[in-house]
Amino acid sequence: METILQPKARPFESLKRKRFREWLRPSTAHGSLLHSDTLDLRDFAKPNPADTFSNLDSGHCPLVTTPIKYECPDGKSSFFRGDTKFETLFSNRKFYEFKDNLKRGLKKIRHGRNGHQSEKRCPVVEETKKSVSDNLDKPDNNTPCFDRFHTNSKEFETQFDHSNRSQNSEKAYLDNESCWNLSEKFIPFNNLKYEDLKHFEENLQSLAPATFTPIESNESLDRSDSTRGTKRSIRNDSSDTTSEKRLCLKQYSDEPESDHSMESTPSIYITKEVQERIEALSSTDSFLIEKVDFPSNKIGSSASDYESDNEYRNMDEDSINDVTTEKEGNVVIPDSNTSTVDAMEKPIEVSSALKDDTLDKDIDDASSSYSDDVETTFEPVESEELSDLSDTSSSGSSKIYTIPTFRGLTNRTNISQILSKVGKADLSQDNLTHLIKSHQKKKRCVNFRNKRFYDAFNPYVDNEEDAELSDSENISEMDTDLCIKDRSTSSVRFDENSRLLIYKKSKKLNKDETQSGYSTTEMRSILKTKMNSQHDEESQRASKCDTVGVAQFLHYFQYTEYKRQRNEAENYRLRGEQLSKYYSEEYPLDFAAVECEDSVNDKSDIILSMRATERNIGRQLKGISSQGAQIISLDEDVF
């Protein structure tokens, strides 16, 4: 009869241990010893190549195996696991042996893998040398990005020559025309050789200061070195070439050429020959002067430079004031120190703004000008003879005048000179208004730097004095530049007219509320708002006024009355101290000094005050004489 062992009950066995036990001993778990997993000792003793632990070194870490079926030494009888108590203990021992074998096997496998990888990473020195030599001969595919983009050193020179190769290999050098084209549109630097750049620089230094096409801009001011001269080109935006006015101008400067002198605009003068030719051709709309022989531009004229400069200095300055900015043109100012052979061959574009003969006679017919040593300081004055414009406001101590706007760039003429002439009645508001209207009508460029501006309103100036002053007059350098400068360029704009306020320092200025410029800000209260620190307490009291009880109210009333009575004695002492200070020797009343008509009234007022004090305190003050109102020092026991 077959005996079936039931598994032992293990109430405190964990689920994880139970599952491991079922996997390790399936026969015991199912309650049968005759399970297909039963092994014979002879089968178990044979080495299994598929077993993971069979490849390990048996001498180093021998495996402990426990069979499931055991045979006796006599070979007749055999027994299985679990038949007796000894078999059960032997089964538990097998479990621990299996655990040890498993740990050793995993450790051996891990050690074997690490050793195999180290052998691959660290080969023998001979094998390493051999592999390196093989890699040099045979390209490695581990760096495909480097193999794709790297460049051999032999190809560097070829690539450099190819990148620096000129686009136009047939043309070795550049001519003058191509140089100017390059100045407008630069060729890439990689396409120019060293010889081309060197030749380009030499051509730029040797070119004459002739008129050239301006670059795409409204107004170009080209400044070059002293060897090339100063060139200035003003673009003509007008598309109608027939209406161009052309004028030949000459540059003059007393100072030697330097980098600092080139920063300021040079003075421009017009020769008498050019003026005569312009007057002769003033009837035509446009004309062209092809060649002008300046004395300073002739070859071998170094000896007569001083005479030619004086000749340009003694010119007619009326023509300079006639230059207008309404009609624009191209003006070129050549330098006298540069060669002008090529410049004379080309036509010089000039501006004929002197055609208009209907100029302001008040300025052209002036015969003299005021001296430069005018007072730099001016005391504001008030003149009743000065008339006001419709938009000019005035008051008893101040006046506002409308004057043309000018730029105070020099120290020779400032606004104090204008004010001094207004104070002397040489310049009035009527004359200023007439001047403003004439400029607006004729679009003329007139400013206060020209001394003739003041001569136009002075009819008592001698003509001889004007002739002497005109010889030594030197026009500001920036004046002509402002006249010729193109209005279409982007620059700072100023109003044509300005407001001038004249007032007296000794009088207070009456501000007019109707004038926005003198209007004050809104009136603000000088009282400062303070936060109420007892706002919360007061709000709570107000909310509890309707809910307070009678008993609580009486209790509060009695408390306040008790507090008032307690402080009454202190209040009595404070009142007496106040009265003693009021009628004391520290502040005596000097009745002897009061000897005027109101002395009787003053004495009676003092007596009335003392009587009122006695009524308030309920007793009579001591020390007061019945015959007079003299105050005597009070003792401490008055009250």
Curated annotation (Swiss-Prot):
Gene name of the record: GIP1
Protein name in UniProt: GLC7-interacting protein 1
Entry GO CC: prospore membrane; protein phosphatase type 1 complex
GO MF: protein phosphatase 1 binding; protein phosphatase regulator activity
UniProt biased composition (Basic and acidic residues): 116-140, 220-247, 352-361
Subunit field text: Interacts with phosphatase 1 (GLC7).
Coiled-coil ranges from the UniProt annotation: none
Originating species: Saccharomyces cerevisiae (strain ATCC 204508 / S288c)
Annotated spans, Disordered: 110-143, 215-264, 352-396
GO BP: ascospore wall assembly
Compositional bias per record (Acidic residues), positions renumbered to this chain: 372-388
